[in-house]
UniProtKB/Swiss-Prot annotation:
Pfam families, per database record: AMP-binding (PF00501), AMP-binding_C (PF13193)
Record keywords, A-Z: Ligase
Record family assignment: Belongs to the ATP-dependent AMP-binding enzyme family.
Function noted in UniProt: Catalyzes the transfer of CoA to carnitine, generating the initial carnitinyl-CoA needed for the CaiB reaction cycle. Also has activity toward crotonobetaine and gamma-butyrobetaine.
Pathway given in the UniProt record: Amine and polyamine metabolism; carnitine metabolism
GO terms for biological process, alphabetical: carnitine metabolic process; fatty acid metabolic process
PROSITE patterns noted in UniProt: AMP_BINDING
NCBIfam families, sorted: PRK08008.1
Protein name: Crotonobetaine/carnitine--CoA ligase
Catalytic activity: 4-(trimethylamino)butanoate + ATP + CoA = 4-(trimethylamino)butanoyl-CoA + AMP + diphosphate; crotonobetaine + ATP + CoA = crotonobetainyl-CoA + AMP + diphosphate; (R)-carnitine + ATP + CoA = (R)-carnitinyl-CoA + AMP + diphosphate
Length: 517
């Protein structure tokens, strides 16, 4: 069944401009408060100009172009401008430094880069090392360095016509993007995403939150991340809704932005919820139009209830990863929700819990969460130039091994336990880091928490907590370990505590555990 009707991204944008015309498509708010607005017609014209810009710089179908940008209109222009001419976007995490960025450039074969002045010194050094295929850099800023191979993105774009000049034949099976995984446990892998993947993501994510053309979807998730692209942007654009892209998250500003733009849908991760909850109470906390808050793992029930009660919202849980494109397990718009369940398998997907021998497990037993989809359509196509890694997680019949552990109940609701690599082996017992983190997060003095296993000569692994305290609080080891003993089984009680000012996180708010072991 062809859910997207054979329509690639170029056709999508031409149709959106015709159907929705002067309706607001995109609102971007920068960290300095500058706001840019584009109608569907204007946005399509900017996308066309950007496509023409790339064509004048020698970019053709199949070429890879890297983007190292914070949330901004130029990211959207480039994403779909490249897709219109059959070129391939390679978004780079804006937090990455030189060595990691070089590695992605090398392993994606990107020949052109679009970035901003703040990141340019790093790429100037990368070019001098001559270790990549990069031959040109476009800067989104007005002022330019007097360097060879550097040009102004804005000036070049504004010189282009608003109609597309180069339109090679496209297929929905063509690659639109190579999105590198966050690499929290190993080197990032390039996830190949097709035009079909992105079109399907729009329809699927819109179904998941019952999105309409009168909705306003606001996000602070980074544009280089799968959540922003496939859960938010593609859903909003596919339904003719308004997409609000905020440059960076600010706990002090976020709720005001939700209210100012009259958002009906937004998305939150645990870090956002915890930092919002320590903001001063306001009589206007529940003065909003939010219908759903898309939520991604992981939160204790106490934290969830407190957040929902204070702000008058409900969470729509969604579980997925870069390779699944969307939240393939989640709550459904009209169905019951069963916290702490992560929901049920969505349409076009199957889900199973499997044991270490790849055999399906019955309800109630913990094993690996496995998902069945269609590669290149409802799940990723492959890892770029890495067939060995692809074969390790993706079976020939479309079953994807997530590397996450969980279980399901008799009614088909799934429950997340932990990443397999985060399960601690302690004296013959398996201990979930997430379970312990959810318990410790209820301590009134603790704002943020991560638990890791460290080598122990007697019990395989000992358990250590890294915590961030609420402002002005102090916490003794005696108080902390007493709390643990009162709230968890004896074999789960932690051995070590380290108090920190912050915790290392990637772009999607996930703790980078390998930096703590």
């Amino acid at each position: 069944m062809d859910i997207i009707g054979g329509q690639h991204l170029r056709q999508m944008w031409d149709d959106l401009a015709d159907v929705y015309g002067h309706k607001t498509a995109l609102i971007c708010e920068s960290s300095s408060g500058v706001v840019n607005r584009y109608s569907y017609l204007e946005l399509n014209q900017e996308i066309n100009r950007t496509a023409n810009l790339f064509y004048t710089l020698g970019i053709r179908k199949g070429d890879k172009v890297a983007l190292h940008l914070d949330n901004c209109p130029e990211f959207i222009f480039c994403w779909f401008g490249l897709a219109k001419i059959g070129a391939i976007m390679v978004p780079i995490n804006a937090r990455l430094l030189r060595e990691e960025s070089t590695w992605i450039l090398q392993n994606s074969q990107a020949c052109l880069l679009v970035t901003s002045a703040q990141f340019y010194p790093m790429y100037q050094q990368i070019q001098q090392e001559d270790a990549t295929q990069l031959r040109h850099i476009c800067l989104t800023d007005v002022s330019l360095p007097a360097d060879d191979g550097v040009s102004s993105f804005t000036q070049l774009k504004n010189q282009q016509p608003a109609t597309l000049c180069y339109a090679p034949p496209l297929s929905t099976d063509d690659t639109a993007e190579i999105l590198f995984t966050s690499g929290t446990t190993s080197r990032p892998k390039g996830v190949v995403i097709t035009h079909y993947n992105l079109r399907f993501a729009g329809y699927y994510s819109a179904w998941q939150c019952a999105l309409r053309d009168d909705d306003v979807y606001l996000t602070v998730m980074p544009a280089f991340h799968i959540d922003c692209q496939c859960t938010a942007a593609m859903a909003a654009f596919s339904t003719g809704a308004t997409f609000v892209l905020v440059e960076k998250y600010s706990a002090r500003a976020f709720w005001g932005q939700v209210q100012k733009y009259r958002a009906t849908i937004t998305e939150c991760i645990p870090m956002m919820i915890r930092t919002l909850m320590v903001q001063p109470l306001s009589a206007n906390d529940q003065q909003h139009r939010l219908r759903e808050v898309m939520f991604y793992l992981n939160l204790s029930e106490q934290e969830k209830d407190a957040f929902c009660e204070r702000f008058g919202v409900r969470l729509l849980t969604s579980y997925g990863m870069t390779e699944t494109i969307v939240g393939i397990i989640g709550d459904r718009p009209g169905d019951k929700r069963r916290w702490p369940s992560i929901g049920q398998a969505g349409f076009c997907y199957e889900a199973e819990i499997r044991d270490d021998h790849n055999r399906p497990l019955p309800a109630g037993e913990i094993g690996e969460i496995c998902i069945k989809g269609v590669p290149g359509k409802t799940i990723f196509k492959e890892y770029f130039l890495n067939p060995k890694a692809t074969a390790k997680v993706l079976e020939a019949d479309g079953w994807l091994h997530t590397g996450d552990t969980g279980y399901r109940d008799e009614e088909g609701f799934f429950y997340f336990v932990d990443r397999r690599c985060n399960m601690i082996k302690r004296g013959g017992e398996n201990v979930s880091c997430v379970e312990l983190e959810n318990i410790i997060a209820t301590h009134p003095k603790i704002q943020d928490i991560v638990v890791v296993g460290i080598k122990d000569s007697i019990r395989d692994e000992a358990i250590k907590a890294f915590v961030v305290l609420n402002e002005g609080e102090t916490l003794s080891e005696e108080e902390f370990f007493c709390f643990c003993e009162q709230n968890m089984a004896k074999f789960k009680v932690l051995s070590y505590l380290e108090i920190r000012k912050d915790l290392p996180r990637n772009c999607s708010g996930k703790i980078i555990r390998k930096n703590l072991k």
